[in-house]
């Protein structure tokens, strides 16, 4: 029987590029906040040792699919014959900066860690997650996090109760191209971790994306009438924070017909946080 598990989106409340390693990876500082908008990952255990993707994502082969790769990565730690069928219900846009693919992969790791009775501790599961991509460990970490390094050095950080209006411009932003852009500044001074405030920092990738994708700038400008609007990740999604659900929903109701978006609540912990032994 299939079981359903949420894969929540993330927002980068700020994202600073503070340097670049010799291997080309960028050194970052960011605060990651999970929100209650989510994909759903359906898992059905098998005893034939096979990992089967049910339904294809457009343009994503099975070998590239992060959910399949996550299951394959954990499988050697499981009992012989452990397998799984994987099906995704996508609500999060691809190429939107909400971490949907990374979150889907993390949910597979978190859920199968329990369902396959692997019971790896969180730090070991995060190390596996990093092999799938720089954004995957934060979803396994499962809390609002101050991130450094390439995004894998994580510390828990308190964040206020917040509701977010998230707008989804109709463009797909390729992350690698934005990080490779010659106009990207890579020398933002590093911050010391401190009590987080909503106006802290900025997103170094935002000017690059706005310069290449004017639709993102148009959405930022509209949302900026109501609060401090920012881009998450490498875009294209943009967001603003509000103290109450009513305030956020009143902004969403004013959204022009030419734009799309949603309201989401900030989460303090991942819904599957307790699936991992400490």
From Swiss-Prot:
Amino-acid positions noted as binding ATP in the UniProt annotation, renumbered to this chain: 93-103
Biological processes, Gene Ontology terms: isopentenyl diphosphate biosynthetic process, methylerythritol 4-phosphate pathway; terpenoid biosynthetic process
Pathway info: Isoprenoid biosynthesis; isopentenyl diphosphate biosynthesis via DXP pathway; isopentenyl diphosphate from 1-deoxy-D-xylulose 5-phosphate: step 3/6
SUPFAM superfamilies: GHMP Kinase, C-terminal domain, Ribosomal protein S5 domain 2-like
Family: Belongs to the GHMP kinase family. IspE subfamily.
GO molecular-function terms, A-Z: 4-(cytidine 5'-diphospho)-2-C-methyl-D-erythritol kinase activity; ATP binding
Top-level taxon in the UniProt lineage: Bacteria
Described purpose of this protein according to its UniProt entry: Catalyzes the phosphorylation of the position 2 hydroxy group of 4-diphosphocytidyl-2C-methyl-D-erythritol.
Record bears the keyword Nucleotide-binding: yes
This protein's UniProt keywords: ATP-binding, Isoprene biosynthesis, Kinase, Nucleotide-binding, Transferase
HAMAP family: IspE (MF_00061)
Reaction(s) this enzyme catalyzes, per UniProt: 4-CDP-2-C-methyl-D-erythritol + ATP = 4-CDP-2-C-methyl-D-erythritol 2-phosphate + ADP + H(+)
Active site per UniProt: 10, 135
Entry EC no(s): 2.7.1.148
Annotated protein name in UniProt: 4-diphosphocytidyl-2-C-methyl-D-erythritol kinase
């Amino acid at each position: 029987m299939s079981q359903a598990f949420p894969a929540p989106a993330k927002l980068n409340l700020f994202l600073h590029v503070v340097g670049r390693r010799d291997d080309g990876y960028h050194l970052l500082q960011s605060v990651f906040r999970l929100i209650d908008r989510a994909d759903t990952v359906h898992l059905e255990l098998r005893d034939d040792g096979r990992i089967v993707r049910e339904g294809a994502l457009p343009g994503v082969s099975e070998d590239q699919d992060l959910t399949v790769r996550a299951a394959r990565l954990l499988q050697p730690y499981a009992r012989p014959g452990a397998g799984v069928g994987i099906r995704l219900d996508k609500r999060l846009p691809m190429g939107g900066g909400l971490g949907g693919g990374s979150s889907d992969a993390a949910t597979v790791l978190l859920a199968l860690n329990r369902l396959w009775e692997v019971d790896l501790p969180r730090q070991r599961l995060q190390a596996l997650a990093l092999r799938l991509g720089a954004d995957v460990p934060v979803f396994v970490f499962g809390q609002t996090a101050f991130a450094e390094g390439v995004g894998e050095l994580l510390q828990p950080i308190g964040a206020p109760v917040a509701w977010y209006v998230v707008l989804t411009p109709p463009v797909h932003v390729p992350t690698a191209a934005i990080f490779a852009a010659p106009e990207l500044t890579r020398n933002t001074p590093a911050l010391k971790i401190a009590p987080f405030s909503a106006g802290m920092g900025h997103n170094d990738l935002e000017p690059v994306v706005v310069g290449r994708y004017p639709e993102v700038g148009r959405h930022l400008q509209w949302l900026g009438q109501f609060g401090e609007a920012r881009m998450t990740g490498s875009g294209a999604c943009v967001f603003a924070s509000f103290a109450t659900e009513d305030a956020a929903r009143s902004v969403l109701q004013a959204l022009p017909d030419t734009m799309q978006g949603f309201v989401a609540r900030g989460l303090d912990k991942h819904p599957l946080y307790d699936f991992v032994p400490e």
